[in-house]
Amino acid sequence: MKIRSICFLAAVVQLLPLATSYANAAGESGVASVYSTESGGRTASGAQLNPGALTAAHRSFPFGSRVRVTNRRNGRSVVVTVNDRGPFVRGRIIDVTPAAAQALGFSGLTQVTVERE
């Protein structure tokens, strides 16, 4: 019984990244928000927070990932580079810089689709 449990756990550990990457490739929908630039500090990747850059915070995409964010309300989209972690507010799936929000045509919050490029 113990060996079966170990084999099952090993299989799950090996297959979980595949399931996650498939889900990420298929895209996710939810709420996007605009970064607060008041702190003016560094991102989780160590980069300086630049409000004029097309960057974003995502909970699970690796740093350096390029993702297409599409505003579901107006159809506008932009490709951003993930260089931070977040958002840490329930129901939100991505934080974008003010420059990315401007390109997407929103301020505050909006419904988006996020897909890896």
Residue ranges: model-predicted function:
Residues K2-E117:
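Secreted/periplasmic proteins
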